[in-house]
């Protein structure tokens, strides 16, 4: 994660906001600049290379001493150009602009995956500019829009039916913020009501074929399959988000779609956290609640059907 200001700067014209990509030499200059404490929240003028991110975000960038955004990579240049182009297409009126927008935390790995989708000539994001803009705005947390399958970050599809798609998330080859993680993302194909029987069938499929994984939600109507061993760390992260929003007077919104496949322990734990229960108490729910009898029965049917097929 990193703030929008780590990638783009802006200027206010008479009628609209104009966005500009930040170049890697500007970042490098900012990282070695001595800046007064009361000026660190402002964009930094490098004199030679244009505007750099506010020095208060210097810790977001990779150096010899710390892990962070690899601003010297080609992907950084591609991403800043994509963000500037996208934001300029949105055409934000000057009178509606608020400086805090540049402090919005964007999903860096999500955005780098979108770069891969956009480069894929067979992917709809390669040619559909309108869809591309919406997908980028979702990744930047700048719109309250459901991340449906056409808008999702990965196009490595491992399962699909009429309602759901599962894509594999691979961050290991990323240049900006590489991460070794075994995860998948679940998205709905269209915004429509999904019959209970289809939810149950999908929940059973996940439980049988992804039995090392748990389906979780961060409350935005898309879901992740994460290893059971990672449940606690994901819950801790969401707990920090809830506390941060409360501290800064923001309303934390959580919507997992009430889907049958969401891990019941996760659903209970997050529900308790949203209700004010401490993490120490809520975390005990993560591994103590079993799937519903309906889902267990549907899973057993998959197994028995497969055994019958082998027998024949």
From Swiss-Prot:
<dbReference type="Pfam" id="PF02509">
    <property type="entry name" value="Rota_NS35_C"/>
</dbReference>
<dbReference type="InterPro" id="IPR024076">
    <property type="entry name" value="Rotavirus_NSP2_C"/>
</dbReference>
<dbReference type="GO" id="GO:0017111">
    <property type="term" value="F:ribonucleoside triphosphate phosphatase activity"/>
</dbReference>
<keyword id="KW-0479">Metal-binding</keyword>
<keyword id="KW-1035">Host cytoplasm</keyword>
<dbReference type="GO" id="GO:0005524">
    <property type="term" value="F:ATP binding"/>
</dbReference>
<dbReference type="GO" id="GO:0003723">
    <property type="term" value="F:RNA binding"/>
</dbReference>
<feature type="binding site">
    <location>
        <position position="185"/>
    </location>
    <ligand>
        <name>ATP</name>
    </ligand>
</feature>
<dbReference type="GO" id="GO:0030430">
    <property type="term" value="C:host cell cytoplasm"/>
</dbReference>
<feature type="active site" description="For NTPase and RTPase activities">
    <location>
        <position position="222"/>
    </location>
</feature>
<comment type="subunit">
    <text>Homooctamer. Interacts with VP1; this interaction is weak. Interacts with NSP5; this interaction leads to up-regulation of NSP5 phosphorylation and formation of viral factories. Interacts with host DCP1A, DCP1B, DDX6, EDC4 and EIF2S1/eIF2-alpha; these interactions are probably part of the sequestration of some host SGs and PBs proteins in viral factories.</text>
</comment>
<keyword id="KW-0460">Magnesium</keyword>
<keyword id="KW-0067">ATP-binding</keyword>
<dbReference type="GO" id="GO:0046872">
    <property type="term" value="F:metal ion binding"/>
</dbReference>
<dbReference type="InterPro" id="IPR003668">
    <property type="entry name" value="Rotavirus_NSP2"/>
</dbReference>
<dbReference type="InterPro" id="IPR024068">
    <property type="entry name" value="Rotavirus_NSP2_N"/>
</dbReference>
<dbReference type="InterPro" id="IPR048306">
    <property type="entry name" value="Rota_NS35_C"/>
</dbReference>
<dbReference type="Pfam" id="PF21067">
    <property type="entry name" value="Rota_NS35_N"/>
</dbReference>
<feature type="binding site">
    <location>
        <begin position="218"/>
        <end position="220"/>
    </location>
    <ligand>
        <name>ATP</name>
    </ligand>
</feature>
<keyword id="KW-0378">Hydrolase</keyword>
<keyword id="KW-0547">Nucleotide-binding</keyword>
<feature type="binding site">
    <location>
        <position position="224"/>
    </location>
    <ligand>
        <name>ATP</name>
    </ligand>
</feature>
<comment type="similarity">
    <text>Belongs to the rotavirus NSP2 family.</text>
</comment>
<keyword id="KW-0694">RNA-binding</keyword>
<dbReference type="GO" id="GO:0019079">
    <property type="term" value="P:viral genome replication"/>
</dbReference>
<protein>
    <recommendedName>
        <fullName>Non-structural protein 2</fullName>
        <ecNumber>3.6.4.-</ecNumber>
    </recommendedName>
</protein>
<comment type="function">
    <text>Participates in replication and packaging of the viral genome. Plays a crucial role, together with NSP5, in the formation of virus factories (viroplasms), which are large inclusions in the host cytoplasm where replication intermediates are assembled and viral RNA replication takes place. Displays ssRNA binding, NTPase, RNA triphosphatase (RTPase) and ATP-independent helix-unwinding activities. The unwinding activity may prepare and organize plus-strand RNAs for packaging and replication by removing interfering secondary structures.</text>
</comment>
<dbReference type="GO" id="GO:0004550">
    <property type="term" value="F:nucleoside diphosphate kinase activity"/>
</dbReference>
<feature type="region of interest" description="RNA-binding">
    <location>
        <begin position="202"/>
        <end position="238"/>
    </location>
</feature>
<dbReference type="InterPro" id="IPR048573">
    <property type="entry name" value="Rota_NS35_N"/>
</dbReference>
<feature type="binding site">
    <location>
        <begin position="107"/>
        <end position="109"/>
    </location>
    <ligand>
        <name>ATP</name>
    </ligand>
</feature>
């Amino acid at each position: 994660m990193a703030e929008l200001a780590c990638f783009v700067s802006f200027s206010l014209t008479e009628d609209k906001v104009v966005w500009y990509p930040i170049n890697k030499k500007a970042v490098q200059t900012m990282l070695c600049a001595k800046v007064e404490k009361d000026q660190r929240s402002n964009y930094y003028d490098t004199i030679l290379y244009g505007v750099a991110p506010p020095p208060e975000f210097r810790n977001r960038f990779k150096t010899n001493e710390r892990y962070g955004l690899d601003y010297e990579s080609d992907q950084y240049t591609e991403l800043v150009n994509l963000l500037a182009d996208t934001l300029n297409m949105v055409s934000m009126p000057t009178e509606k602009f608020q400086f805090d927008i540049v402090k919005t935390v964007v999903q860096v790995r999500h955005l780098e995956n979108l770069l891969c989708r956009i480069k894929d000539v067979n992917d709809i994001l390669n040619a559909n500019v309108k869809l591309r803009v919406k997908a980028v705005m979702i990744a930047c947390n700048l719109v309250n829009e459901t991340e449906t399958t056409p808008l999702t970050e990965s196009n490595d599809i491992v399962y699909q039916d009429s309602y759901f798609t599962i894509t594999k998330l691979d961050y290991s080859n990323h240049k900006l913020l590489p991460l070794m993680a075994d995860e998948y993302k679940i998205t709905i194909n269209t915004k429509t009501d999904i019959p209970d029987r289809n939810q149950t069938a999908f929940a059973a499929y996940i439980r049988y074929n992804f039995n090392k994984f748990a389906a979780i939600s961060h409350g935005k109507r898309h879901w992740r399959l994460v290893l059971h061993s990672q449940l606690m760390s994901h819950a801790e992260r969401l707990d920090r988000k809830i506390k941060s929003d409360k501290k800064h007077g923001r309303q934390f919104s959580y919507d997992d779609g009430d889907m049958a496949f969401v891990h019941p322990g996760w659903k209970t734990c997050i529900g308790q956290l949203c209700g004010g229960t401490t993490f120490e108490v809520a975390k005990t729910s993560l591994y103590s609640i079993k799937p519903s009898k309906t889902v267990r029965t549907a899973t057993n049917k998959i197994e028995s059907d497969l055994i019958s097929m082998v027998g024949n």
